[in-house]
A protein has these predicted regions:
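Conserved nucleotide-binding/hydrolysis micro-motifs of P-loop NTPases
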Residues: 7-12, 34-41, 50-54, 98, ...
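Conserved SF2 helicase motif VI
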Residues: 8-9, 164-188, 205-207
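Short, high-confidence coil segments that cap the C-terminus of an alpha-helix
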Residues: 86-89, 135, 154
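A short beta-strand element within the Helicase C-terminal
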Residues: 139-140, 147-162, 168-171, 186-190
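Post-DEXD/H (motif II) to motif III coupling segment of the RecA-like Helicase ATP-binding lobe
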Residues: 1-46, 209
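Conserved helicase ATPase core of P-loop NTP-dependent helicases/translocases
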Residues: 91, 101-102, 108-146, 168
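Helicase-associated low-complexity regulatory tails and linkers flanking the ATPase motor
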Residues: 179, 195-225
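Conserved interdomain hinge at the start of the Helicase C-terminal
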Residues: 55-106
Length: 225
């Protein structure tokens, strides 16, 4: 008898069919919110911080380039991360290596950056430090840290423009809701923009949060004021 387990059943039909072919039909489900109620997982709150941007773009890639390269925005985001890190270890997930590098340059010795180019042992050494650290910031690409790592002592999870993929968003939050001896709650920070495509993607994510029973609030921030 073989059991197939997954924490995230895809919503897109083609992704679901690939999973169905590998594992077979779904025979039972237990949601993260149920595990939170049972005390197995840490409770969470999603803080959506929507940076006010007045730039307009005709396609998503041009918009992303602006969101990840505008120096003033990056200064603001780095400042937010440093502030929330005062409450405990922080994991920051980014989509692009360039964005991770820019944030790292703004945080100095308070942060480390890991990506696919970082050797596996070096990545693991940084992850292991979280077990005893009190104010460590790990900046990582979604590709290396969104799944498959165990970091229970993350008290703040920052998602920088996480997009509209159900699997990516929910699996990323899964990095933060693992419990530790000194942790039963995690703050999730969804950093996004008022730009056209980012706003559409946020609408999708808010639907994901509602479905998962993750409480959330939205705050707009004029970073250029």
């Amino acid at each position: 008898l073989r059991w197939g387990l997954t924490g995230t059943i895809p919503k897109e039909p083609f992704e679901f069919q690939a999973l169905h072919c590998s594992l077979g039909p779904v025979i039972n489900q237990l949601s993260a919110s149920e595990l939170q109620e049972k005390g197995v997982l840490a409770n969470c709150h999603v803080n959506v911080v929507q940076l006010i941007d007045h730039a307009e773009f005709t396609n998503y890639q041009s918009e992303l380039k602006y969101l990840f390269e505008e120096k003033g925005r990056l200064d603001t985001i780095a400042g937010l991360v440093i502030e929330v890190n005062k409450t405990g270890n922080t994991l920051v997930l980014v989509d692009r290596i360039s964005a991770g590098t820019e944030l790292l340059n703004r945080m100095g010795d308070e942060a480390v950056f890991v990506s696919g180019a970082t050797k596996a042992k070096a990545r693991q050494d940084e992850y292991d430090e979280v077990a005893t650290a009190t104010g460590k910031i790990i900046i990582a690409t979604y590709g290396v840290a969104a799944v498959g790592i165990n970091l229970p002592r993350i008290f703040n999870l920052v998602l920088l423009e996480p997009g509209k993929s159900f699997v990516r968003v929910i699996q990323s939050i899964g990095r933060g809701i693992r419990k530790a001896e000194d942790k039963d709650h995690v703050q999730i920070w969804d950093i996004t923009s008022t730009c056209r495509f980012a706003k559409r993607h946020l609408t999708k994510r808010k639907a994901f949060y509602r479905e998962a029973n993750y409480p959330f609030s939205v705050e707009k921030l004029d970073w250029n004021a």
